[in-house]
Amino acid sequence: MADETKPTRKGSPPIKVYCLPDERRAIEEKAAAAGMSLSAYLLAVGQGYKITGVVDYEHVRELARINGDLGRLGGLLKLWLTDDPRTARFGDATILALLAKIEEKQDELGKVMMGVVRPRAEP
């Protein structure tokens, strides 16, 4: 039998696409958001694959910070609920402020989560 080799992408002719500079910039931004090269992004989109973006590391870091804050606030609330002697000096105003702070952190967490999800869901 003859020695047959499989064709590779590098050995195949490229497909040229004409676009305006702002269109190219938009495509490059979407490829970068997906963590892909421009070529890999266009190949995947052209074949109908659903592109999933890479979560922004700043959002992840912020979510971790808020989660830690909620854990600390929850620990304080737990101490108060168990009538721990260390929390005997806490008055009702302090506990209400703690509950308000927990609610504020939960709202902040929701906003950051929407910031992660919303850009990926909209075109």
UniProtKB/Swiss-Prot annotation:
Q: Where this protein primarily resides, as one coarse class? A: cytoplasm
Q: Which GO terms describe its molecular function?
A: DNA binding
InterPro entries assigned: NikA-like
The record's subcellular location field reads:
Cytoplasm
Tree of life domain: Bacteria
Q: Which UniProt keywords apply?
A: Conjugation, Cytoplasm, DNA-binding, Plasmid
GO cellular component terms listed in the entry, alphabetical order: cytoplasm
Matches recorded under Pfam families: NikA-like (PF21983)
The UniProt function text for this chain reads: Transfer of plasmid RP4 during bacterial conjugation requires the plasmid-encoded TraJ protein, which binds to a 19-base pair invert sequence repetition within the transfer origin. TraJ protein is bound to only one side of the DNA helix. This nucleoprotein structure is the initial complex in the pathway to assemble a functional relaxosome.
Q: Describe its partners and assembly state.
A: Monomer.
Full protein name = Protein TraJ
Per the UniProt record, the source organism is Escherichia coli
